[in-house]
Every structure is written in structure tokens, then in C-alpha cells.
Amino acid sequence: WKVGKNILWAGFILRSFNEARFSPSVKWKAFIQYLAQWITGKEPDFYPASIVHYGTMENLEDSEKFEHCRKEAIEKGVRWLERFLVDEGNGGIKEGIAHNIDSDGKYTVLDGVRTDCTGESAGAFKMYAYLSGEKEYAALAGKMEKIVYGPMFIRGGRLDGMVRWCTNSWNVCYQDDVARALLPGLYDALYMGNCSHVEDICRAMDFLIRTTAKDGLRIFRTDNYDLTEMEMDRLRQEEHGLPSAHYNAYYHAALLLAGRASGKRQYTEVAQKGLERMMELYPETAREQSETEEMCRLILPLAVLYQSTGEEKHRQMLYRVAEDLQKVRHPFGGYREWDTGYRAAFSRESREECSVLTENGDPVADLLYSSNWLPMGFAFAYEATGDRWFHELWKDSVIFCLKTQMFSDRTHLDGAWCRAFDMDLKEAYAAPHDVGWAAYACETGWTVSEILMGMMMPDILKKRK
């Protein structure tokens, strides 16, 4: 604001406007140019180039260019992941980058080691090795898996099979995080011929089942200090768990794939009960971030459920969710965040985690909690149904990722995807209230590795055949 006639006062540091990626960039560019003219009396001679541009400029409707860009995006994503390894993979991988950018344009690196991020990133490396023939990535994945199935995995006693959340929350178990850490081991067993982790994965599923309610749903997490035999029995005897795709859908996907890998019918039965219960309540499930997230999270497990049972009612569940999801598709290719009634746990919060929409209709896609799951989900849906519509949805979701991947000479950004993308502005921009994972956050696991695996899965499935 102006103080007198010749002083402009700013309540925050402006000098890092470019490095800190102030957005919307068009508005900030106009404002910075105005300041320069006000100070100097003339139009500025130049404006600094953005440190990030989003996506390829190629025509992705052309099949050859699509395949070239997909291959390039996978390679860039794999290189980005390598930059966050701990001790060359022997210590796992860092979580990624937080939303926060300080006054000098420095990013906050989330350097804790999470089991889910480590397992997911190992999965991306292993798929890349399988398809490219670059064996060093398979060796790298093997080192990372020693973290997942080593110190993060309890063996023996009443907690046998419990998988730890992360290095600074040693006794916490989120079944969603466990599932995402272990699903790559199931992809490996079922589609790449390596069954070395199936026995341990079954132990982890057995532990989760021992703390799952009668309806096939688990509470959002368990803490080891609470889990006496009496408490575990109480959890099993509860009629209902938490009907949330955020917390339970990928647990069910892991159960179903573990059932196929091991032949244990119980896994399929528990997953079927849980998914059928959620679909009884759908779309009024217990939302964490948004209604869009719940739909995106359900595609993979419902596809695997139909693949496992062949039942028409399960096919109809898959199509119902996939068709509902199209109602929030944006012309740019992503899916708008939507939350009917704003009932999600983190809807429009300002003190902790927060969804990225301010109101329904915002043209914002969430690549941490929603759109990131779709390449893998649609790949499995096509595999389960043979319906070309799902193949086109897979391709559409990949094209969206190709148009939102970051290109930059800053190595901590180049090749990654950030959490939120405004599909009108065509840049990262959204409600900034989340304390750690707002628009600019980049997760090694949840986002980058999941997108990469989803991009590669059709090739894995084709190679198996």
C-alpha cells in the first residue's frame, strides 16, 4: 500500500516472487511490472522466465507423440525420485517436498522416511527396470524393500505382521499406507513373476484382518500401545468400521490381490464385504478430503473386485463410480475437486490438513488424493472388463499427467507433479490452508510413484500376456 506519495509498503517479502512461484502468475506479473514502472518511471525491459513450466507442448492426440511423451515423462519421474533417496536407497526414500517456500525461495524438504513412500517408489523403480531392462533399478528397489520388510515390519507376537507408518511414528498403523507400501509386491508377484514377498504380505493382511470390523471395514488407524488382545478382539466384534475409501479402499485392493496371489479365500471375502458396505452408503461415504477423492480411490479396488468375482453387481458398482466421476471432469482432462455439502473431514479447514477446493466448481485437480490414483485404477478397470472406454479413460488420465508434470532447471522440481493444479490457469494454484501438503507439495510416494506405476501398468499387463 502507499504511504504518502512516494513510498510503497509491502507486508511480506516480494523479491522472491519468481523463485517462490507466486500465483496466479499472470496477475503477479502485471503487479510486478506495475511496481517496476512506478519505481523507475518506465516499462521494465524484461521479466524473468518462470522457473517451472507445466507439461509438454506436443500434440498428445497423436499416438506416436503420446507414446514418446509418456516414455519421457516416466524417465523424468524416475530421475526425480532418485534425488530423494536416503543412502542410495539403503535407508529408503524421503517423503518429498512440502508446500512451504521461505522468503529466499528455499523449499522445505520432508526428509522423514515413510514406509508407504518407500514401498511405492520401490514399485516404480521395479516396474521401470522390468520394462527398460535397466537392472540397476531392480537392485535399487530391492534395497528399498529391505526397509519395508525389515525394520518397518513386526515379526512375532500378537502384533505379527504390523507394518509401521514411518520412522518418527514407529507404533502407528494406517491400513491405507500399509496397502500402498505392499501393493507393488503384489503387482510384482502377479504380473512380473516375483513372489518373494507374498508370504510377508499375507502376514500383514492377517494382522489388518485381526483389527477389522465385521463389515470388512477398519477404523482409520491403530496404535500399538492400545492393541491388547482384548482390544483387538473388540475391534473384530464391532459391527461397523469406517466407511471411507480414503482409509479402506486400497486395503481392500491389497486384500483382493493377496487373495489371488496366495489362494486364500478369506482375503477376498473380507474385501468384498467392505466394498459392498461402502457402496451401500455411496456416495455418502466418510470423506476425508472430498467426494472426488472417494470416487477416484474406489476405481482400483472395484475393478479388482469384479476381476476376482465376475459378479454383475460388482461390475455395476465399478461403472457407477466411473460414470459419476465423469460429472466432475474438466475440459482440460483432470477431475474437479467436489464435496457435496462440504462434509469431508478436512473441507475448508485452516488449522491442520485441508482440501484444496474453496467451493464446489473450483477448476482444481488434486494429485495427492484424487487424480493421481486414476492411471492405475483405469488400467485395472480395462484389464477387468475389456471395455475400450476404460482404456480411453486411462489414456485421458495419462494425458492429463503429461500436461501437468513440471519441467524446470531446478532439480528438486524437474519431473515431479505437485499436489494441486488449476485447470483454468494451467498452473499450480489452490486453497493454501493445508499445513504441510498444500498446492506445491510433491510426494515421492502418494503422487509421483503412483502416477508412474499407473503409466506403466498397461505395458506390464501386455508383457505378461
Residue ranges and their predicted role:
Residues 27-34, 50-54, 66-84, 133-151, ...:
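Extended, well-ordered alpha-helical scaffold segments
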Residues 101-118, 163-180, 188, 230-248, ...:
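Solvent-exposed loop and edge beta-strand segments that line ligand/cofactor-binding
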Residues 190, 195, 206-261, 265, ...:
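Active-site lining segments of carbohydrate-active enzymes
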